[in-house]
Amino acid sequence: MEMKQISETTLKITISMEDLEDRGMELKDFLIPQEKTEEFFYSVMDELDLPENFKNSGMLSFRVTPKKDRIDVFVTKSELSKDLNLEELADLGDISKMSPEDFFKTLEQSMLEKGDTDAHAKLAEIENMMDKATQEVVEENVSEEQAEKEVETIGYVHYVFDFDNIEAVVRFSQTIDFPIEASELYKNGKGYHMTILLDLENQPSYFANLMYARMLEHANVGTKTRAYLKEHSIQLIHDDAISKLQMIEMG
């Protein structure tokens, strides 16, 4: 297994067929998302010594490209939380019901109403950010594998969120109305942390960032990685945390 940093925001992890076999994985396992695939991603991330600028990212995207003799896993960190003022985002209303087009239109109007003369430039930066990770993966594949037939690319995104108390965790869980591939709940000191894995198959390129923005309405940006939480925290719910917490009725 080899890791290469191809940009400030993207890592490329190459895993041979022998490594896959040793982990009990086959190429077909990546075509239909399942718990086995989730654990594969987590185990790879736990083993690797990630660069410092990746260790504190609250959102990591996984994109898998199977090849004839290996798979390439592209891991991209998002800088969305640094590019958007979350207080301004909260002023936009219920973005969970907005289409992507309405989201950008509302954000632009909010900037203009606040006298932001750079509103259009900021919108362009946000849109470019959402396309950047996908473009990096495409360019890397084209430059290295022009003569090689590609198999369908499958993507996943992994988030970590922080909460001050268990009530906040339950309220967050009850706002989730879209499919979650996997979720875990940890306790570290007085705080709580949740990991979430989403499947990006058949989703538009902006889906991961839009879901991240929606969830940040009810959560704090993650300050720990899953590897750190597994080693230093108490795991309260091992799997399907969202569904289990949704069964709790708040008084």
Swiss-Prot record:
Query: Where does the UniProt annotation place the signal sequence?
Result: none
Q: Which GO terms describe its molecular function?
A: protein-macromolecule adaptor activity
Cross-referenced InterPro entries: MecA_C_sf (IPR038471), Neg-reg_MecA (IPR008681)
- Coiled-coil residues: none
Function according to Swiss-Prot or TrEMBL: Enables the recognition and targeting of unfolded and aggregated proteins to the ClpC protease or to other proteins involved in proteolysis.
Tell what the record comments on domains. Answer: The N-terminal domain probably binds unfolded/aggregated proteins; the C-terminal domain interacts with ClpC.
| Family affiliation | Belongs to the MecA family.
- Which HAMAP family did the record assign? MecA (MF_01124)
Q: What name does this protein carry?
A: Adapter protein MecA
